[in-house]
Swiss-Prot record:
It comes from Burkholderia thailandensis (strain ATCC 700388 / DSM 13276 / CCUG 48851 / CIP 106301 / E264). Pathway: Cell wall biogenesis; peptidoglycan biosynthesis. It is an enzyme of class 1 (oxidoreductase). The keyword Membrane does not apply. Belongs to the MurB family. One of its GO terms (biological process) is cell division. Keywords: Cell cycle, Cell division, Cell shape, Cell wall biogenesis/degradation, Cytoplasm, FAD, Flavoprotein, NADP, Oxidoreductase, Peptidoglycan synthesis. The active site is at R173, S249, E345. It is found in: Cytoplasm. This is UDP-N-acetylenolpyruvoylglucosamine reductase. HAMAP family: MurB. PROSITE patterns: FAD_PCMH (PS51387). It catalyses: UDP-N-acetyl-alpha-D-muramate + NADP(+) = UDP-N-acetyl-3-O-(1-carboxyvinyl)-alpha-D-glucosamine + NADPH + H(+).
């Protein structure tokens, strides 16, 4: 797949503002930053004495990070572009995209090219390269279900390494790259397997309701119909980061065992929950937060969104420390009332 900017030379940018590179809009600065347009540029930095010894952070869309201070290291801005059908067989298309490609634009492109399968993941903020790190998911599907492989540069050596699904060790909003591999690799491209036999994923009531509101019979819904429905739902529920700084869902939906769930339901009969294949129950974190009275509330300029309790927002002038303080107050209240620990989705730095 062709990659943008084949030149391996890298310009370093000192005292670089990251305000435009994180969706909360925090005005923090990086000691050094570099715009990366090719795998070769990532590799060249491994041998560059100008950045030797600096901690490195790869940023795509900045939609999964909370900066609580300036970053005293090297920020690598992933701008590797390109998308193409890499190959196909009788069963599936294998589509490769550069790590710096906008995720939503990539999903829309696959549909335009007649290759459905990612439509439930429409309008998730961020880049293609960030999708495996977080194992993004929405409306009944996770990225790992469509994942084939990825290529990543090991930052210490400049070596390009291939990862299959097993090596990525995907979990719920989790992967190897959020744990042991954190800070060690930069994802340069991802290949997705999109099955040629397609059926809509309509397990979430919101999607079925939106299709019905549009006069579409769910049994006859096309991939584009599902895409449009998901986009409409997300736009109605979630604020645009360009208008109100946020990082999407701030907390993971907690999963508890059957015994803990039975005890919780005895106290809270209407708790919003979803059964899991292993017998455990996934709780709706937004419901827990709302029940604690946090929806629409604020601590200074950091607030809980008034339409979606899972989303924390920067109303203007908030710092990462403000958002983190709000998140911890919410975690404390949910734990005290329900005995359930909420885990943050974004990385806090």
């Amino acid at each position: 797949m062709p990659m943008s900017r084949p030149d391996s030379s890298v310009q370093l940018l000192s005292d670089y503002s990251l305000r435009a590179h994180n969706t909360f809009g925090f005005d923090v600065r990086a000691r050094v930053a570099a715009r990366i347009g090719s795998p070769e540029q990532f590799a060249s930095l491994a041998r560059d004495p100008r950045v030797a010894g600096l901690d490195a952070l790869v940023l795509g869309g900045g939609s999964n990070v909370v900066f609580t201070r300036d970053f005293d290291g090297l920020v690598l801005l992933d701008e590797i572009r390109g998308r193409a059908l890499a190959r196909e067989d009788d069963d599936a298309w294998y589509v490769e995209a550069g790590g710096g490609e906008n995720w939503h634009a990539f999903v829309e492109w696959t549909l335009a090219e007649g290759m459905p399968g990612l439509e439930n993941l429409a309008l998730i903020p961020g880049t293609v390269g960030a999708a495996p790190i977080q194992n993004i998911g929405a409306y009944g599907i996770e990225m790992k279900e469509r994942f084939a492989s990825l290529r990543a540069v090991e930052l210490a050596t400049g070596e390009i390494v291939e990862f299959d699904a097993a090596r990525c060790a995907f979990g719920y909003r989790d992967s190897f790259f959020k744990r042991e591999g954190r800070g060690r690799f930069a994802i340069v491209s991802v290949t997705f397997r999109l099955p040629k036999v397609w059926a809509p994923r309509l397990g979430y009531a919101d999607v079925a309701r939106e299709l019905a509101a549009r006069g579409i019979d769910a049994s006859r819904a096309s991939a584009r119909d599902v895409f449009d429905a998901v986009v409409a739902i997300r736009r109605a529920k979630l604020p645009d980061p360009l208008e109100l700084g946020n990082a999407g869902s701030f907390f993971k939906n907690p999963v508890i065992d059957a015994h803990a769930y039975a005890a919780l339901r005895a106290r809270e009969p209407d708790v919003a929950s979803y059964p899991q294949p292993d017998g455990r129950m996934k709780l709706a974190a937004g419901w827990l937060i709302d029940r604690c009275g946090w929806k629409g509330r604020a601590l200074g300029a950091a607030a809980v969104h008034d339409r979606q309790a899972l989303v924390l927002v920067n109303r203007g002038g908030a710092s990462g420390a403000d958002v983190l303080a709000l998140a911890r107050a919410i975690q404390r209240d949910v734990l005290e009332r329900f005995g359930v620990e909420l885990e943050m989705e974004p990385v806090c730095l």
